[in-house]
Amino acid sequence: MLIKDIILTPMSLSAVAGLLPLLFVAFLVLHEPIWLLWYRYAARRHKCSMPRFIEKSFPLGIQRTMDMIKTAKSYTLLEVQYDRVFNKFKARTYLRQAPLQYQIFTIEPENIKTILATKFNDFGLGARFHTVGKVFGQGIFTLSGNGWKQSRSMLRPQFTKDQVCRIDQISSHAAELIKEMNRAMKVDQFIDVQHYFHKLTLDTATEFLFGESCESLNPENQSCIVARDGSEITAEQFVESYNFLLNYAFKRTLSSKVYWLFNSKEFRDHKKRAQSYIDYYVDKALYATSFAAENSIAEKDAAAESSGIYVFSLEMAKVTRDPVTIRDQIFNILIAGRDTTAATLSFAIHFLARNPDVFNKLREEVLDHFGTKEEQRPLSFELLKQAPYLKQVINEVLRLAPVLPLNFRTAVRDTTLPIGGGPEQKDPIFVPKGTAVYYSIYMVHRDIKYWGPDAHEFNPNRWENLKLDNVWAFLPFNGGPRICLGQQFALTELSLTLVRLLQEYSKIEMGPDFPESPRFSTTLTAQHAPPGVVVRFS
């Protein structure tokens, strides 16, 4: 009798089937201790110590992941994590169990510096390519290694000061913002300013990216684009799909190695609609640059420069003729150009409404530097930088409400972090290849070790003579080679919009049930949780 005949008998198959549940239970029980035993041995080989605390979550970290999703839905994720780190675990760097893997969590600036700068080549984006990249494409925020380097070299020339400091364009959109807010306040009195800030930043971002604004601040705008398949898509429909994709990408990120479970038909439909909308403008850019090549591209460039017009998609079409590459980069830039700035403006209004003394002091500086509503002085990038208290206020908003409160990198090789191991948390810790290292800028920015006992308080005056013990304790735009390319654009838009608002209004009133502290809704970026920032200007 052959061996295969023995193996394939009904009795043997039944025995194997009966063993499967036992094997699965054994895997659940033994996976964690075996991995930790190996990790302890590997750490000693690399002359590292074990982290002081290990957050276990049976089985396989699934319960902890479900808890994170639950707290994210209730808008308490960041607060719960803060309480765990500083009060429950009392560990600034620790191991935690996630589905099918262990992760490292840290709030140490020296570790963050190591990840983002000194050992930059030891870390990549890991699963982000699959969790987020499959949603928003292969762009600068989802690529690692050579792909990221190529994206960076392609995009860096597009973000020079002359190209991103678009004072006139931002000013015109800020004027439309104020008109629309005034119209809304005549009807409802109290309004959610975050809703209008998202429209503002969408309009400025699309004008920068496409050469024409979506005009979402214009209530009479009913325009739409015609996609390649002949379907019509409005700006409102695009935003609906875009917002869905942001939330979906965040769920895929939290799900760790089982991200592939999130692949619904609704997701695919929204992705197709959002891509089709951007493809319309990509096709226009490719056609325009192709036409220009046949009719003296030098003349067309000269005309564009003389009019002060800069269009991101047109410039990208001169660098690459691949429509998917252009679309993916636009998708990636839009995340930074729209959501982060709108969120920061919203948090700024929250803090100013809660702190009328700060509002009054800032308004006094604005009127002194930039003139009144009736006698506005011409704004410039240089003039905006000459308002010290405005800069202090923006820095304090970015400190307490960072738009990327939680981030991660994945080790591409066995490596180490300088501190976090041993009873005193001062020894190096081992990071195995493939391990995700999460870091929380939200917690670093609220750490009393660097910011003092009033770290949780909104106090722009702290920036007047501030000298941080560690410059990596303030990272509103990330750090190292992957530092945000568009930070100057964001700061210009933030500053100019606040100036125009404070020229227009002399008072902010808080709406009903206005929260004492901002409530964070966390997707790929942070924003104020519903019902938003409900105020009335006068």
Curated annotation (Swiss-Prot):
CC cofactor: heme
Gene3D superfamilies for the chain: Cytochrome P450 (1.10.630.10)
Topology in membrane: Single-pass membrane protein
Temperature and thermostability: Optimum temperature is 25-30 degrees Celsius.
Alphabetized UniProt keyword annotations: Heme, Iron, Membrane, Metal-binding, Monooxygenase, Oxidoreductase, Transmembrane, Transmembrane helix
Domain of life: Eukaryota
Keyword Hydrolase belongs to the record: no
Predominant location category: membrane
pH sensitivity of activity: Optimum pH is 7.
Induction text: Only expressed in stationary phase.
Record GO cellular component, one term: membrane
Transmembrane segments: 18-38
Record: residues binding heme: 484
Similarity field: Belongs to the cytochrome P450 family.
PANTHER family: P450, PUTATIVE (EUROFUNG)-RELATED (PTHR24287:SF1)
Name of protein: Cytochrome P450 52-M1
Organism: Starmerella bombicola (Yeast)
